[in-house]
């Protein structure tokens, strides 16, 4: 992705064959992503969110690498009026990665440099979340 425009796909041999395209040699997935950071802190993103869920943990492996569809267990905190209110757990997030990336409003400067994926917190304008109140 360059300037918000998709430039190409990350394809294993299998997915390249299915799409009648050329492999990019990424059969094991992506291991070296660096997204640009901004001046926003995670607290800034939480305030900008207003109300929603701050995800802090994803559980399981529910991503289709060919279609980008995902369904993952998650946990985090409920946010109301830009303030963390209480923990939430046993929720599910679902959607499509392409659509999710198009919904990024801002990326924070709290980059975790452990591992090969360097990215700050992301604020999405919408996401499908399911769960029940106890």
Residue ranges and their predicted role:
Residues 1-134:
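Dual-mode signal for accessory low-complexity, basic/Gly-rich regions
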């Amino acid at each position: 992705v360059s300037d918000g425009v998709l430039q190409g796909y990350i394809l294993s041999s299998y997915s390249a064959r299915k799409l009648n395209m050329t492999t990019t040699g990424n059969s094991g997935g992506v291991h070296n992503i660096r997204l640009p950071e901004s001046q926003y802190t995670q607290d800034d993103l939480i305030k900008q969110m207003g109300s929603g869920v701050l995800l802090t943990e994803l559980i399981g492996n529910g991503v289709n690498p060919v279609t980008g569809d995902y369904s993952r267990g998650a946990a985090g905190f409920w946010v109301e009026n830009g303030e963390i209110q209480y923990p939430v757990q046993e929720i599910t997030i679902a959607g499509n990665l392409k659509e999710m990336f198009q919904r990024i409003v801002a990326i924070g400067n709290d980059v975790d440099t452990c591992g090969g994926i360097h990215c700050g917190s992301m604020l999405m304008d919408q996401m499908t979340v399911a769960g029940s109140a106890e």
